């Protein structure tokens, strides 16, 4: 089993929802009515995204080399 640690960006939307994106997985996004729900949903989305990449032979992108400090949380996805 392999574990991926992925940085997540959470954005508070005007309609009280939270959007979640993973910059290292282009197009991988989700949302929730709370920060916690958005994190749970983005973890599920990341698992599907990574499983699909592995199954189709695309390989999983490496984390970005940029050095940045994030206040946002990270998630761990184990496959």
Locations of regions flagged by a protein language model:
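Short, charged, surface-exposed hinge/linker loops at domain edges
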Residues: 1-6, 41-79
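A detector of short terminal or domain-flanking linear segments
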Residues: 1-7, 11-12, 29
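A short, exposed loop/beta-hairpin motif centered on an aromatic-Gly-Thr core
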Residues: 26-37
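Hydrophobic residues in alpha-helical membrane-spanning segments
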Residues: 24-27, 62
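An amphipathic alpha-helix/helix-turn recognition signal
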Residues: 15, 33, 40-41
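Short aromatic-glycine-(Arg/Gly/Cys) micro-motifs in beta-strand/loop hairpins
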Residues: 11-25
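Short amphipathic alpha-helical segments
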Residues: 19, 36-39, 47
């Amino acid at each position: 089993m392999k574990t991926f640690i992925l940085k997540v960006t959470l954005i508070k939307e005007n309609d009280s929802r939270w959007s979640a994106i993973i910059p290292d997985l282009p197009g991988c996004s989700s949302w929730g009515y709370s920060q916690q729900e958005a994190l749970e949903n983005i973890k599920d989305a990341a698992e599907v995204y990574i499983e699909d990449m592995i199954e189709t032979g695309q390989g999983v992108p490496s984390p970005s080399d940029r050095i940045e400090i994030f206040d946002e949380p990270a998630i761990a996805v184990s496959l």
